[in-house]
Swiss-Prot record:
It comes from Mus musculus. Interacts with PtdIns(3,4,5)P3 and PLCG2. This is Dual adapter for phosphotyrosine and 3-phosphotyrosine and 3-phosphoinositide. It is found in: Cytoplasm; Membrane. Keywords: Cytoplasm, Membrane, Phosphoprotein, SH2 domain.
Length: 280
């Protein structure tokens, strides 16, 4: 008899509190955790927390990397950060700590832990985001219904959505006219990179449209460490991170954004070419 079957057979006769304290029943009891969202994707987690969460909201979900690995998705001010949670078979590992049971793991979150990453941003985990939320059973009635196009088929239905892929943190930026370096707060959402005077500023100094960016790469011309640049037709922006790891993270996510943008543009061009061929 397997471990899961054994646990299932004992579930009705044992006190649930005893099961929560067991080291071998961790993943089976995750289903009873109200803020465990199962196989929720990274994209869906970001959309959920950004649209309906608040600073300090978090949820636990399956990681798509390997069995026994989970992702803790946390809402910061303007982004969602993801952290690994590992189940070893007898304990949960998160951050610098290891918990011998799910009960101890959850108790840690009940005490509102403070965590920080390479960005230097500190977050207090205050608000577990529930898997189930009450919703009204209200539907709209269709009053107008017609087709705006003709001659299209199911092949024209290509689901597309911009990747959220959020990130935020302080970077040191070189000025445009006066080549001095100033520390600014940067946020990345969808295809926009914004920078602010500081983290508390309500309005950005500038918004950069990444659809106009042609390249992101490490830079060694400014005689500064952890420096990288964004190339636009009108200007090259030079940015420096505090650490090499942080610079690498910014470069990776920005390059990933550019690859997605180019892919969407290529798909759009292919669609236009195929339609022009049909109507020739």
């Amino acid at each position: 008899m397997g471990r899961a079957e054994l646990l299932g057979g004992n579930m009705s006769t044992q006190d649930p509190s005893e099961l929560w304290g067991r080291a071998d029943g961790g993943t089976d009891l995750l289903q009873d955790l109200g803020w465990y969202h199962g196989n929720l994707t990274r994209h869906a987690a970001e959309a959920l927390l950004l649209s309906n969460g608040r600073d300090g909201s978090y949820l636990l979900r399956d990681s798509n990397e390997q069995t026994g690995l989970y992702s803790l998705s946390v809402r910061a001010k303007d982004s969602v950060k993801h952290f690994h949670v590992e189940y070893t078979g007898y304990s949960f590992k998160f951050g610098f700590n290891e918990y011998s049971s799910l009960k101890d793991f959850v108790k840690h979150f009940a005490n509102q832990p403070l965590i920080g990453s390479e960005t230097g941003t500190l977050m207090v985990l205050k608000h577990p985001y529930p898997r189930e939320v009450e919703e009204p059973c209200i539907y709209e009635s269709v009053r107008v219904h017609t087709a705006m196009q003709t001659g299209r088929t199911e092949n024209d239905l290509v689901p597309t959505a911009p990747s959220l892929g959020t990130k935020e943190g302080y970077l040191t930026k070189q000025g445009g006219l006066v080549k001095t370096w100033k520390t600014r707060w940067f946020t990345l959402q969808r295809n926009e990179l914004k920078y602010f005077k500081d983290q508390m500023s309500p309005e950005p100094i500038r918004i950069l449209d990444l659809t106009e960016c042609s390249a992101v790469q490490f830079d060694y011309s400014q005689e500064r460490v952890n420096c990288f640049c964004l190339v636009f037709p009108f200007r090259t922006f030079y940015l420096c991170a505090k650490t090499g790891v942080e610079a690498d993270e910014w470069i990776k996510i920005l390059r990933w954004k550019l690859s997605k943008i180019r892919k969407q543009l290529d798909q759009g061009e292919d669609t236009v070419r195929s339609r022009s061929f049909i109507f020739k």
